[in-house]
């Protein structure tokens, strides 16, 4: 029986000293949306609280709850997912007895809510021991939450194989519906006027279905940001041609009116113009993830296919690709901004210029030549809008 905080700390020590025990890197409890036809198929996992490299005592109590009822836990595996039973919650709350009347213990508060709302097979405990290729839908969602809540940096977590594990489903008011269910019940649903309004069909939900952004972040259309994106405070996502994919986003306040593809990152103070595209790792970059530096301007309908440093401009309507050849101007001034780069020729391929600062990519309107020169303009966002 745990009656004091000293008892609790002793229990945690005993659990963590068990042979093979490993502290998880991340853990949380998810509410599950299961398939309408296949109840074993997980369509979505929603987390209200994510723990990342913290609250190890809470993790130890939950893992001990499962071991108490005979669940085998492989601490050498990369992840552990277990459906919650009411007895698990009761055991955990009994261990947390010295803290039950105190404020500020979010994991305890969450358990109290789940106990009140408990239904069989609706909640799962999910933890990651190592960052390896995900093995379950629940662990994919945990990783997407880690990205979207900015607990881990973009491109720092393994999502290989996620597409293969997630089901392609219909989404109605942010709830997933099996396409097989709709086909099997189409006549009944339509003839009884119960056919759901389908908002979209995809493997990923929308960012705003799971994440509450900062007060100074604006997203003008929910469809424009996929779950797993990361938006820094002060970012504005305009309607129209804007889009931010999973494992992509901004690291500071930005204006986004174009497309930030998967694995692309945009730095603070940059402006992605209307219809501009930043290529992702699957769209013409030879697998090279693109980062756009601080205070850059990607003109309307431009295409950026190489990493950019700070204070760069890509003029409207042009494509800066790895193989695009550019005539270099202002070499002496550019060398001062990029002292570790040797500007020793007149013609460069785009890929050779990756990551350099102060570049202005443009096209000569008479000759048609692609030119890269010193950026002599300051890119500054309207502070009133961010």
From Swiss-Prot:
Residues reported in the UniProt entry to bind succinyl-CoA: 259, 274, 277, 300, 315-316, 323, 349, 362-365
Catalytic EC class: transferase
Pfam families listed in its UniProt record: Hexapep_2 (PF14602), THDPS_M (PF14789), THDPS_N (PF14790)
Presence of keyword Cell membrane: no
UniProt-listed InterPro entries: Hexapep (IPR001451), THDPS_M (IPR032784), THDPS_M_sf (IPR038361), Trimer_LpxA-like_sf (IPR011004), Type2_DapD (IPR026586)
GO MF annotation list: 2,3,4,5-tetrahydropyridine-2,6-dicarboxylate N-succinyltransferase activity
Cell location: Cytoplasm
Domain of life: Bacteria
Pathway(s) served: Amino-acid biosynthesis; L-lysine biosynthesis via DAP pathway; LL-2,6-diaminopimelate from (S)-tetrahydrodipicolinate (succinylase route): step 1/3
Amino-acid biosynthesis among keywords: yes
EC number of this enzyme: 2.3.1.117
GO cellular component: cytoplasm
Main location: cytoplasm
Record: active site: 257 (acyl-anhydride intermediate)
SUPFAM superfamilies assigned: Trimeric LpxA-like enzymes
Catalytic activity: (S)-2,3,4,5-tetrahydrodipicolinate + succinyl-CoA + H2O = (S)-2-succinylamino-6-oxoheptanedioate + CoA
One of the GO biological process terms: lysine biosynthetic process via diaminopimelate
Family from the record: Belongs to the type 2 tetrahydrodipicolinate N-succinyltransferase family.
HAMAP family: DapD_type2 (MF_02122)
Subunit structure: Homotrimer.
Function field: Catalyzes the conversion of the cyclic tetrahydrodipicolinate (THDP) into the acyclic N-succinyl-L-2-amino-6-oxopimelate using succinyl-CoA.
Name of the molecule in the record: 2,3,4,5-tetrahydropyridine-2,6-dicarboxylate N-succinyltransferase
């Amino acid at each position: 029986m745990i009656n004091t905080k000293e008892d609790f700390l002793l229990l945690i020590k005993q659990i963590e000293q068990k042979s093979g025990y490993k502290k998880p890197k991340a853990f949380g409890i998810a509410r599950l949306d299961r398939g309408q036809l296949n109840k074993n198929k997980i369509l979505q996992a929603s987390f209200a609280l994510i723990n990342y490299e913290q609250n190890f005592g809470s993790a130890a109590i939950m893992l001990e709850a499962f071991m108490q009822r005979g669940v085998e836990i492989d601490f050498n595996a990369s992840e552990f997912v277990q459906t919650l039973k009411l007895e698990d919650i009761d055991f955990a709350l009994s261990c947390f007895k010295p803290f039950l009347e105190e404020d500020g213990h979010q994991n305890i508060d969450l358990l109290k809510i789940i106990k009140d709302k408990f239904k069989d097979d609706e909640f799962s405990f999910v933890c990651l021991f190592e960052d390896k290729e995900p093995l379950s839908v629940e662990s994919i969602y945990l990783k997407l939450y880690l990205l979207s809540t900015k607990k881990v940096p973009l491109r720092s977590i393994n999502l290989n194989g996620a597409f293969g594990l997630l089901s392609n489903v219909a989404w109605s008011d942010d709830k997933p519906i099996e396409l097989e269910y709709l086909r099997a019940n189409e006549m009944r649903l339509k003839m009884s006027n119960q056919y759901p309004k389908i908002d979209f069909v995809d493997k990923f939900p929308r960012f705003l279905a799971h994440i509450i952004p900062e007060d100074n972040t604006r997203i003008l259309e929910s469809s424009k940001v996929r779950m797993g994106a990361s938006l820094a405070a002060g970012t504005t996502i305009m309607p129209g041609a804007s889009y931010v994919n999973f494992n992509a986003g901004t690291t500071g306040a930005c204006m986004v009116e174009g497309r930030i593809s998967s694995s692309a990152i945009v730095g603070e103070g940059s402006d992605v113009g209307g219809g501009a595209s930043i290529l992702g790792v699957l769209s013409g970059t030879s697998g090279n993830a693109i980062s756009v530096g601080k205070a850059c301007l990607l003109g309307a309908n431009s295409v950026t296919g190489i990493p950019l440093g700070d204070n760069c401009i890509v003029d409207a309507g042009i494509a800066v690709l790895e193989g695009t050849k550019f005539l270099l101007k202002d070499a002496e001034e550019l060398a001062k901004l990029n002292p570790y780069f040797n500007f020793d020729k007149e013609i460069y391929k785009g890929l050779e210029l990756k990551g350099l600062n102060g570049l202005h990519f443009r096209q000569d309107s008479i000759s048609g030549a692609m030119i890269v020169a010193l950026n002599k303009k300051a890119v500054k966002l309207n502070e009133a809008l961010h």
